[in-house]
Amino acid sequence: LTVDKIVVNISSEAIESNLYEISVPIKDTQVSKKDIETAFMNAEEQNVSDDKVIIETMPLGFSIDGVRSIEDPVGMYGKKLDINISVITCKRSIVQNLNNVIENAHAKISKIIISPFASAIATLSSDEANLGTILIDMGAGTTSYSVFSDGIFKYAGVSPIGGNYIT
């Protein structure tokens, strides 16, 4: 058996979770995938720097002309599309070091997932995610947390304080 692609997770206080509300004028009054892509690019541009890498960009919710709670706005009509977006970033050096280790094992990273998100997906029921949950995962050296509401991931982070510092 040869493993050539690996999904890795990062648990580091260098993880940042930023929330944005991006407004995009709707061309031709009907929302297209291009309008949504433009909003994502605008959110990602606010996170571009030499020392950070974008791990994940996730939509949290859509609204058209002030009407909220739209699941999929493509094909709907309006003048202004607002998208709430979560952008997860990490220090570039951490991702480069992970990539180096994986490449030295003759494999490639297929996806990077942040630990707080992975913990939540592995442990939360759909009811818990829908009702709203803050999942706290305390390890020896770090404590990670993720926030879910209405079944949607909202925010995450990692604190450099773990069980070793408390007990």
What are these regions (language model features)?
Residues L1-L135, I152-K154, G163:
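Nucleotide/phosphate-binding catalytic cleft detector across ATP-hydrolyzing
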Residues A156-V158:
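Residue-level detector of high-confidence beta-strand sites
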